[in-house]
Curated annotation (Swiss-Prot):
NCBIfam families to which the protein is assigned, alphabetical: fabZ (TIGR01750), PRK00006.1 (NF000582)
Function text: Involved in unsaturated fatty acids biosynthesis. Catalyzes the dehydration of short chain beta-hydroxyacyl-ACPs and long chain saturated and unsaturated beta-hydroxyacyl-ACPs.
Native organism taxonomy: Bacteria, Bacillati, Bacillota, Clostridia, Eubacteriales
Entry protein name: 3-hydroxyacyl-[acyl-carrier-protein] dehydratase FabZ
Species of provenance: Ruminiclostridium cellulolyticum (strain ATCC 35319 / DSM 5812 / JCM 6584 / H10) (Clostridium cellulolyticum)
Class of this enzyme: lyase
Biological process annotations from GO: fatty acid biosynthetic process; lipid A biosynthetic process
Gene Ontology molecular-function annotations: (3R)-hydroxyacyl-[acyl-carrier-protein] dehydratase activity
Family: Belongs to the thioester dehydratase family. FabZ subfamily.
Reactions catalysed, as given in the entry: a (3R)-hydroxyacyl-[ACP] = a (2E)-enoyl-[ACP] + H2O
E.C. code: 4.2.1.59
Family annotation (Gene3D superfamilies): Hotdog Thioesterase (3.10.129.10)
């Protein structure tokens, strides 16, 4: 388990773009389960959509990427490196994420070589899948 402070030591993101609140399960280089508490005060709800607030799908993907990045960032070889997006594959959005939801972020590292990582990711609320697919990211020198 990682606290928010420990997450901030691994990821360069800060408010309002740090989208992982805590890590509840971590197998370095293999998998991660993390949580994003979706507050009614999130800045993106002001415009998406004021009368019917829904977390934008692209931010769900970003939250998944941040979670997956943590699984790799904790490895000694990646200390001080920055994870950057390299691709998204077969991402499907199945349910909406709304204020008050607890978004569970899961990532399983499928392969990681030559600085590029591919992960199977899933975001869910109360066991219902909100989004799932695969992402790729590269670890580069910051």
């Amino acid at each position: 388990m990682l606290t928010n402070k420990e997450i901030r030591e691994l990821l360069p993101h800060r408010y309002p773009f740090l989208l992982v609140d805590k890590v509840i399960e971590l197998e370095p280089g293999k998998k991660v389960v993390a949580v994003k508490n979706v507050s009614a005060n999130e800045p993106f709800f002001q415009g998406h959509f004021p009368e019917y607030p829904i977390m934008p799908g692209v931010l769900i993907v970003e939250a998944l990427a941040q979670a997956a990045g943590i699984a790799v960032a904790v490895l000694e070889d990646n200390k001080g490196k920055l994870g950057v997006f390299a691709g998204i594959e077969a991402m499907k959005f199945k349910n909406q994420v709304m204020p008050g939801d607890v978004l569970t972020l899961e990532a399983e590292i499928l392969v990681s070589k030559l600085g590029v990582t591919k992960a199977k990711v899933k975001a869910s609320v109360d066991g219902k899948v909100a989004a799932e697919g695969e992402i790729k990211f590269a670890m580069t020198k910051a």
